[in-house]
Each structure stands twice: as C-alpha cells, then as structure tokens.
Amino acid sequence: MNFQEKLHSGKFVITAEISPPKGIDTDGMLKEASLVKDIVDAINVTDNQRAVMRMSPLAACSALRQEGYETIMHLTCRDRNRLALQSELLGASSLGINNILVMSGDYPTKGDHAGAKPVYDLDSVQLLGLIQKLNAGYDFSGNRLEGKTGFCAGAVANTEINELMLIKLRKKIKMGAAFIQTQAVFDTGRFCEFMDKIDPI
C-alpha cells in the first residue's frame, strides 16, 4: 500500500524527515534513510530548509526512490517563480515523485546566503491550485499539457491556534490539500487542542 492509498484508507500514517546533503554525496542521506526503512510510510525531503542551500529535493527524492523509498518532496515558493515551479513539478512527476508538500519557505535572511533574493511569485495556496491544474492536464495559464500529473499534494499548518491559521487552513483544503503536516510536536496537550479546533474543517 503506497502513501496515497494509506491516506485514503484512514490508517495511521508515519513519515520521517531527511535533509538533502550540502554537496553531491548522498551516502549520508541514504544511511539516515536506512534507519527508518520498513518503519515509515514515506520520507519527507526538505527544500533548502531554514534557507540553507542544499541539493535539490528533486534529485534527493530520485536517489531515495532508486533505493526503494517512497518520498514526499517539499516545494517552497521562496526560490522559484511560477515557470520554475511548474518545470520542477513536471520533472518530479516524470520521475515518479507524486507526493508533494507545499509551503512558503523560510525567508533567506535566516539562512547561509543572506543576500539571496526571495521570489514568492505564488503563495502556498496558489501553488496548491497550480498543482490541481497540472493534475487536470493544464498549466497555470490554462494551456493543455502533454499528459497530466497525478500528484498527492499536502500543506503545512502551525499548531498555534488563531483565526488567521484557521482561515489559511480552510483555503489550503479548498485548493486540494490531501494531507496536512505540522512541525514536530512536543506539547501533546496543545496538539490535542489543535486537533479539536480543526476537526470541523
């Protein structure tokens, strides 16, 4: 049962997160992945997490898939305009990478290339809408594609409960988010409160 099938089955899903290497040697990443093999349903692969430059998540996911792992490729709006986002997604689909987690991305000043210019051509809600269009066989401008994608797109949410978070979450679900992931949770009471609050959504 793959990740998408397990989501639809209602069974409990377990994922782990791995950062691509800061370089071209994937041995360390693959060794990390081996520690959770047969334990997790998919491995999240970050996209320049905390604005620190690393190998493309597309290449990292491809390397992991060659070793038999199912992946969830992170894709941020920070570094790419709508052309580059679509190219990256089409490339991912052609390589069998069909699980995508979209997010805005940390601002570059937080990372190791403080002078980098952010893009943010689209926000995460618009990126989810873009993925819906690719799945329907069209690009963002409505032009027909040669073959359509089959992405299972997810989004992120902050467990800090406020009205703005709830509005954003509703928009993400409306735009096709099939799953929601949060940062690591250490306060179970707060997380239970978060789950109760979003349950009606």
What is the predicted function of each stretch?
Residues E17, I43, A92, K172, ...:
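Conserved, mostly hydrophobic/aromatic
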Residues L130-F179:
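Active-site/ligand-binding-proximal alpha/beta "capping" segment
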Residues L90-V102:
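Hydrophobic or amphipathic alpha-helical targeting/insertion segments
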Residues M1-K6, D25-D27, A51-A63, N81-L89, ...:
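Active-site-adjacent beta->alpha loops and helix N-cap segments on the catalytic face
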